[in-house]
Amino acid sequence: MSSQKGNVTRSRPQKHQNTFTFKNDKFDKSVQTKKINAKLHDGVCQRCKEVLEWRVKYSKYKPLSKPKKCVKCLQKTVKDSYHIMCRPCACELEVCAKCGKKEEIVIPFNKEPDAPENTENEGSGHRRRCGRKEDSDEDLDAESDSDGEDGDTQA
């Protein structure tokens, strides 16, 4: 077989096929792994987002221990792993915080999506609480009605 790379098509299927997908939290159920899995990759382009998700999926993602230096403002403000720019600089220049290219940002840095979710949750909780209060009022009414009936039968 020749040693040429890239210009050759495979004539046979892969010899060994995995039966189960890799789970990065199967044996490592640490707090750090949970944080990494829950992290939202915002302020990056589609390609960089896919790269970061791949790193998380296959346990290759390493969080920063201390902030890195931003390439634009030269301050130690980069708190996300594999990023080269801090959030304010990336927002201001409208570029990807990881590769620095002027690509379309998939999930922007803004905090607006978090606010509506919280208000929706608070609203639904309010509805639940109101429903509980109404239920408890009905229970009290039912108890007072039953007391009234008991009072009628005794008198």
Swiss-Prot record:
This is Uncharacterized protein C9orf85 homolog. It comes from Mus musculus (Mouse). It comes from the Eukaryota. Residues 1-22, 110-155 are annotated as: Disordered. Residues 136-155 have a biased composition (Acidic residues). Transmembrane segments: none annotated. The modification N-acetylserine is found at residue 2. The modification Phosphoserine is found at residues 136, 144, 146. Signal peptide: none annotated. Keywords: Acetylation, Phosphoprotein.
